[in-house]
Amino acid sequence: MRWIFYPAAIALAGYLAACGGGGTTITPPPPAGNFSNASLNGQYVFSMSGVDLNSGAYIARVGSFAADGQGHITAGLEDVLDLGSGSPASQLTFSNGTYQIQANGRGLIVLNVSSGGTLQLSTSLESSSQGYLVQSDGLASTSGSVELQKPLQFSANAINGKYVFDFSGISFAGSTPSVISLVGEFGADGNGNVTGGTADVNDSAFAPTGATALTASTYQLDTNGNGTNFGRGTMTLDGRTFAFYIVDNTRVELLEEDSLGGSSGPAILQTGVIPTQNSGFSGSFAFLTGGSQTTGNFGPIARVGRFTADGAGGIGTISFFENNDGNTTQVTPGSGISSTSYAIDTNSAGSGRGTFTFRNSSVGTVTYVFYLSSPTRAVIQDVSASVVTDGTMVSQSAASFTTAGLAGNYSFSWSGVELVAPSSFDENYVGQYAQTSAATSNITGVADYAQLGLNTINTNGVTLNAGISGTLTIAGDGTQNNTYKIVIGGPSAFTVNFVAYLGDGGTVLVVCSDGNRTTAGVATPQTQ
């Protein structure tokens, strides 16, 4: 997941300041695990977005590369959109490249551009089929994901069924560039036709649209060889033109390429029984969103929380944490929460669309739209006043969590903005850690991170192989407001404090609780 933080994506112009902290040196633990170069073997889609170093403008890339399992990249292709270049999206081919995957799943991928230059990516693999990425060549601050493709499904008929999508980026629809989030569901017939659907658009230049019907449109794979070789094609959706790369029949990664702006994100096949009325939706869920304020200083904002739906339109046991441009607010169950409800959209039955809302005197009225990709997962969009954010929602079926139950190896990805005068800058982290069952000092690992402004104090603003240590502290039954303290080594060691919410499958959703940054992200268990 990658969010668009307004000052970083539209008007970043400043310098990199020191992160603070002392001179603590953290020795990275020796790489341990079952990963190797053989873990990256096959064709992979990568999807990333963030900020261009030179212009401070939004940049996004989606592409595919082939890895041979022995440290070599044999071919690749990407679409890249840099709104600071003044040029439309371009296509780049990769003639070859190299990579190295350590035993802990961390690695470095270097893609050689056929026309000259390279793209360097740091990765932390969850498994041989997926992982997190951060651009680590100092040319841009982008982050995203890498996913194993199934080349036998590089055809139009692989895109067949209902797909939930979540795109974020920049819009040119208003008088000035604005942040935009698009979430929704569309149907595809496997024969090149988008049969319709429903979407919610939150463009900071306008009011949120609410549920809007999608008209029929088309999609097709490239016929010049890029379709069969890399799974590339194009799609028209909601009046916008996208390039896409097929992961498999369950997932497609898209990049907007038109005059309306630029956005990117996944489309995920709906599976399982999707509720069509309130009685079909119950249980506990944790959620995380990130994005931007749309008034005041237009600063970054990230929110994390949880709730329990009762199957009858009510929500309770609400807990919520917000970092609004470094100003933090925590809402606990029973702390003046009112006007609570949820609704499954019966006018768009079968779309997976729903809403939930609550009110608290500290944060006002908070309202979200979600689209379920399965009974336990959804994409989510914040439509509260004066914010544009989006993110993820996951079920929280466990009644309690413990450090013993969470012990294991994790990959993580955090993105956000460090808030320094006179101008803030974008930051991205990717890494791996081992968590023990101890109550304290239970995290040790390694991270690569990029903290890019227009001028940097570090070489390219990138630090590789920084040791990390810290503690995940479980609060009560662990369903809400846990703390997650990480000390990060490098040229100048620093500490980042997070509030952490836990979801099914060991998912850890975090938002920074410090006043000097608005950073959020996710950690997920490694399965190899």
State each model region's role:
Residues 1-8:
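Bacterial N-terminal signal peptides that target proteins for export
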Residues 8-11, 32:
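Short, functionally important structural connectors and interaction interfaces within domains
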Residues 13-16:
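Bacterial Sec-type N-terminal signal peptides, specifically the leucine/valine-rich hydrophobic h-region
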Residues 19-528:
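Mature soluble binding/inhibitory domains
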